[in-house]
């Protein structure tokens, strides 16, 4: 597949010869030349790349050499396109051009012959025209007028004034950029008067204005602003070039015809439209015209469905379609999408987005990430679609909160996504048609508008307000007007405002109108405002009818239905409009002025109005002018608020007395005058007068005591403390302000205590009496209510009655009232304050009692009866939700019956039908009957009837009143618990009822039935336990089990408890810390015969795929003899402790007659700490609900598994882990036949079981189980003193299982965290986890132990007897285990005790002990011998290897059974191994993530190729005895002093040589001034002098213009250079798709191979803010260890240039493709050392026979010498290989334009380029091919600037002249000892100079870095080491000595080697 599409013609052309192609191309060249010549003058302006793309897509030609600057090049190009391309094809010489400069006319005449007769009609319209046109035309002073009288205003307009006299009728005109200034009337008048035949005109108008856009949607082309009715247009966004035009000037965009007043018709056609530039044709005559018109494209999309969840419902979003789709696809393709990646992708696509686009993309990406997908086409998700669309009916602010709606909107938006287009329906315009209205989103304030002034000039306040006019300056005190005209006169809006005015003026508190609409309008018409009367007079009957509709639909009658409930429907009688309060004198004055204007009723400043009641009798005009307003002088008004009375005994409200208010003084500020009932009336007729509180505001708001729902303060004259059940009050004294307050408000001064309370909203107090002992009995109580409203209730034998208290009022409950009545408060408003004044009892007679005060008294012990049901008010109820679970029931009016049904099991209809027959007295029959109707609330009658009829006592927790109500009927045996809150009943269930539920599940009954029986059988004590919500004890469960005859098997951890074993009902229960659950029938069957297969718990093969891949599958047939031997030992008690016949009454376990069946066992083996158990636990918890049995030989391991199960309960639930078991090995044998068939059986630590255990288990459990064995055969095995004589000689199960079997063994341990363990144990360690640790500690003698040290907390010993020693010396706190006991355990630090007995311990136990510790291990020598002796005793044992660091992995093979295959980690077949890998790596660099493919790589099977293995020739190598110091003595005198070697620049000095020892705690091999590191210069990035030296030598600077010119001059040489190269290397030009894909993959794989942290640290290079043509220059930090750099002075550094990642990602894949194409055809005689190993180089060198004189070449400043000739060769090479032309152009741009902070570079090569090594190598090859006379038999190797040939090369003079042009100059060397890339070449192979390796090894020692680099140095030495004796022939004496020291250092440090190179040195011995 080609990189770019080519048409068939293009494909054929590529097959022609170049000469034929040139012939065909000549025609195209001529055409291009002609076209460029004709159009260059018009399209020569330099435009941005983005604009160039859009203009080209719009069909506008742009010169390829457009370099002329212009202030607004894009709009100028568009103007030229229309004027010089479009218009000339339409017009002819008969046209007159209007409003155009002469040079443009002359240009058209000269260019187009048919326009040589055109002429211009210019005139002065604006002041700028005098400059634009000059004085070269004549204006007529006077002409004959063709206009009629009605045209007088038009002909005098500036636009037409000078034009019309010069235009003849029937002429043809072209108006240049002028029509958008003409108004519609001017255009119609001009067409009517002048009657032109054709009128062409250009219009500049952004079409997006037609859809309300307030900003440009093509900002690259133009920008604009809308200010009032003006459009400010800025071409190319340049404000200095902007101009102003009418906002309505775009009416032609929506016009198809123009109808003239004289009935003439003109047709309007849009001939050309490019963005904001349009060409219109207006032709005379009535012909067919289009009906619709569309404009585009725009950088925007239609908002579509997203408008429904967006603020303001926008029409579009300013982002292009392809951008949105690319970002959407990109985020949907990521496994872990994030907003950073989305913004990076957006920045990659759009280089300079606007702020709105950035904001949209940020929020749009967040929507994509947090919103899932929805299927709407195939298998649609109809339910989600339905509910999602349902939410779209809501406002956007609510719809956006619904997840389903967001999903539907996003899905529809993407599905229907389309670019924004402005579609308009064309209209016919006339002189009187409505002008186009352009609405934008602009919300700017109008200039010159004083809003306060306009408010004042409305109907209210203008004539009466006395204030200085001032502009609006911020938040000023506003006045709330009920009536004001806010809009200009517009009938529809006027009617809406009139409706609101009518409702506000004429509605009372029930929504009832106090007058009809006609009557209101008649009254309104009497106002003095002329404007108002004029507006009202305009209303017709139709308008009044419309007003009625508006009022009826928008303002329906409303009332507080929730408060009145059913009484709302019965509400009759007087309705009263609420009073409203006069705030201040100014308000009063303004209201008076309004009253006078509206109703011609004067009102004085001291008058107060209140509305009289008006009865609604159904008439249409209930208005009465005499009683509508009733003025009452303020000075004579008595201030009495109006209470509303509600009697609960009757459903209807009491009639309210509306008598006339008596006159009384009313001087208090804020006082209120209300009309109506003036007393708190009790049901018995008692009346308590209510009076106002004139000075309520003088109170002190201080409430320090917090109560439930209110705050309080207690005041007393006698300083008494007030205590009660809910708390207590400290006395606040009797302050002065309180005394004055009582005097001012007329409160009797005999009261000596007061409780002040401030309520919250909906506060309440139950019925109570103020008769506490602290107060005087029979004394009156005075109550004050302020700052809010409340319902005050009274209760006596006659019933209950409530009175609503509003405002600041007070009254007194008379003497004796507390003994005969009770009172209550409810429905308090927030902030309502009550003062309760009382009299204290005498001090000697009173006592402090724990009584509830007014706010807390709940009428304790109150009792009544109804229908024989006793109603008891019990103790207060608090914390209902803490002790009970609340069950939800519907709130449809039947909530009580729904709740009761939860206990009775009956439906609502059934219960109501039964109760209808309930016999009750005549008093309650009517009420009960009404309450049994559908959806009617239940009251006391229904509750008592249900209690008596259904036999259920009711316990109701009334949270609103705060107490518990009991409804009891004699003989009832059941009880229902209900909660009443907010007038809603809900059933309650005790929270901790797990015991009851578990019993209920076992007996198959409802929990309520069980609870009822339990309450009956167990009494009140059980009821109290249940209701406390704390659960019950186990002994209670035992009693319940007996009551219900349940045989309960209770699982508590690993133990089983049998309760009531003789019970009839069997049940399995599981008990945890605080919970009991029913698990069904017992999990284990009683007999194996009934153990049937259960599919839901059995595991299938597919459930175990992961386990089977990780393990080795072994076929095994259990041995009956081995099983019987172990069964015998278990039976006689010699093995185990649970299976003995003598001690445990167990029978013989060996099954008789059981057939032995072959079983597949998964074996998962690995070394210590490899993660066997952890891996299994991770996999097991994926087997939710399956049956798993974990078997362990150690109880501690079982406990650990149980802990993991408990942790998993939170995620998997109780059912998920129900069938998980952990058993010790004996319990597993006993229960094997009862396990579920198909269970997963895990045998952990397989090496620790007694021999024959596996056989016995397989025989007992059967072959249906899935078996997996874990363990490590190298660790502790089974050993028991009791059965050692019987089983000691029997081979263990793991050896029997794996005998002769090949299996995987994991040798990678992740346990160890200290480098102390490196090389001491036979395993691989995870190097990243190893931290530097202290050296190994060896303690001599038990007396040297530090018992306070960390290692003393754990000690391992070899026998049980040695535990006594540990206890004696370490103490009791030390955890002491034997080696065997520690199997499977891990500790951080600890010690190992070595005694004389330890030598008899097996190796398996020793390796177990040595591998138990993660961080540190300490050895304590208690063997009474020296460490040297111990080391010799244990020399060939694990302890000796540990001490000597000589442990090897191969030592494990001798201890393992079968044929182990060592693997590193648990490996499985990886399918899609790299899925998501790159995405995770690139999380820290979201920009780079957008540049690489994140796709999963296709899995390919590796083909194993058979390789021939030859035995290497080996001969003895003599290594002379030579010390390091003697080698150093040969050259130490060459090290000069530091001051002589460094370079100076002014006061700066380089820092390349050290004279101090390393700070890395390395070895001191020499004195600090002669360190090995001082041999070589070291470059550091912070060394300024070294960097400047590098810049001066290695970088060349120039400017892009010069470099581009030089490259253009060199390009003709490119084909010549390519031809010479192809002679030697015949590249294939055909494109190879697979090779290109592989090249791209290789680059991306290399780029993402770094760690995620490294990628994130370099993420700034991926950001678009880093310009692509700017590089970052820095010097490479390195130690220059080339042989030529030994003992030299300071040298210049190597410079590196960092490029933007976009540049690398652009070129790197193609450079790798070129490299693959090169290697594809590279002859074998040429070698390129790239991507190859040293072994391959070694083989090629041996084949090349590098003997005798060879040729080497080196270059001076190789990178800087890669000049324009080399780039010309590279460009021709890329074209030859068919690389895209745009890539080649990008490459040329980078090479010529690259710069940095230092300046612009010349054409050269940079280290850091994507193509550095490849093109360096190819330039080296090209230079070699041109410089030398090659015969064809030479073997030459290349690598960058290195070249070496196996013979003497002779210089050729053939290309001498051309070679002199190149900056590239070679330094040729003919030598007998050739080198290449630092390697010596010979016919025996390659080897490194020993001096270099030795000095590097010593430097590594000095810097403590040997462990990290010894592998590399060992590989370099190995080539000479493997040459054997032949290496000596290639070295001199100094080299041989250095080589010996290299080998010696490597062998002595062999334990540090981590690679396979260590095997080469295994036979080495150091004497």
Swiss-Prot record:
User: What sequence ranges are listed for the domain RdRp catalytic?
Assistant: 1748-1855
Q: Which amino acids does the record list as binding Fe cation?
A: 768, 770, 823
Q: Which cofactor does it need?
A: Fe(2+)
Protein species of origin: Blueberry scorch virus
Q: How is it modified after translation?
A: Specific enzymatic cleavages by the viral protease yield mature proteins.
Descriptive protein name = RNA replication polyprotein
Residues of the (+)RNA virus helicase C-terminal domain:
1309-1455
Sites marked Cleavage? 1472-1473
Annotated InterPro entries = (+)RNA_virus_helicase_core_dom, AlkB-like_sf, Alphavirus-like_MT_dom, DNA/RNA_pol_sf, IPNS-like_FE2OG_OXY, OTU_dom, P-loop_NTPase, Peptidase_C23
